Structures are given as C-alpha cells and as structure tokens.
C-alpha cells in the first residue's frame, strides 16, 4: 500500500492493498513493513516523580518513577535510532521514565528528529515547563500532551504551550480514584480553554500502580462516563 503524511498538520492518508498493477483493492493492510509511529524512551529517571507530586495527585506511576534511577538516552544513541527510522516512519513519541522536556539535550533531540523528517511528540507533567521550552515545542513538535496532575504547574504548562501556539492535549489517567472527577469535568466542560483534546488513559497496575485502583468493566460509573464522552464538547476526546 501507499500512504502520505503531512508533517505540518499530522494528516495521514493511505490506500488499501495494491494489486500487481498498482490498483487499490480496497482491502485494508494488516500491517506495514515498519511502524508509522515509534515510542523512544529517552528518559531514564523522573525529576517530577521523585518529588512525590505524582502520588500526591493520585497518579500511581507505572514507570515507578519515584524510585527508579537510570541515565537518560545519549544523543548518539538517539541519532542512531532516528537514522534507522528515516524514510520509514512518520512520528517519534518521546518518552521513558520522566518528562522528555527535562532531558539535558532536549533541544538537540528535537532538532535531530526534524532534520530526518520525523515529527517529535511527547507527554509531560509540566513540572519544568518554561516559555523557552514551549517555543521549542512550537518550532519542532507536532503536538504536546500534559498529564492531568490537578496542580498549578499543570495549568501553567498548558497556558505556556497554548500561548506559544502548540497543539496541546491533556492526558487523564482513569481509575477508581479519578472517574468521578472525569465525569464531572466532562459534564461541565471543565478543562482549560483552547486545548485540542482530552485523552483518557486507563490506570495500569504495574510499577507503583495498584490493582485496587483498576476500574472494573461492570462499574456503573463507566456508563455515566461514556454518556458524557458521547456528548459534544469544546475539545476532542480520545
């Protein structure tokens, strides 16, 4: 099959499977020969996690960021990964154990990505977000997600990114301890004005994540949640 990806807007289109004459058969491809988006774990430790603010906000880190300590990925290793991806993938989701925007060579990682025609994206707690970092995001990134930590630095990070013109999403971890708030915020459209989308992520019972905080498929609150999801909002929902 063939596809096209717009590095400015993120628009993606592709054909179905092609026959020997190059004609679209209308059959969806099972998979590509190479991922169109790749997660790259550039962070080995989490400055935000070690403050205990994740746990204070009710987020049980699946990366065990409060306790784990490792070195961040070197620029050389990152460059090698990017070279192997060039011409075969479209986007890099920078991640790992910590906020990618706090990597000591963050600007260089973004520059390398774009130099090889790859669009970098990442999720951050917003704990160390600055106006300069937000400007870098505007210059190089497709979108940035801010994890919902219910804190002043969360709102400040969102504001800085929006002011810089960055397509900004919110990542909201959904567990037993957060579903009531999610329902109420959706009911009232109570998320910062100007965001692109709220992406709901299920709580993971690994790392610092507990099994007791997992939502059950039979939980009646899920019906209330999806009732709100299906309504029209000022932002997209994923």
Could you tell me what each predicted segment is?
Residues 51-56, 106, 134, 182-184, ...:
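Short aromatic-enriched loop/helix-cap "lid" or pocket-rim segments at secondary-structure transitions
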Residues 28-76:
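Canonical Radical SAM [4Fe-4S] cluster-binding loop centered on the CxxxCxxC motif
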Residues 1-39, 56:
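Flexible, acidic/Gly-rich N-terminal and inter-domain linker regions that tether
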Residues 48-50, 68, 101-103, 178-180, ...:
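Short catalytic/ligand-binding loop motif for oxyanion handling, primarily in non-cytosolic enzymes
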Residues 35, 39, 106, 154, ...:
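A structural signal for well-ordered alpha-helical scaffolds and beta->alpha junctions
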Residues 75-203:
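Radical SAM/AdoMet-radical enzyme domain recognition
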Residues 1-3, 194-238:
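A C-terminal junction/extension of Radical SAM enzymes
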Residues 70, 74, 102, 178, ...:
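Residue-level preference for long, well-ordered alpha-helices that form the structural scaffold
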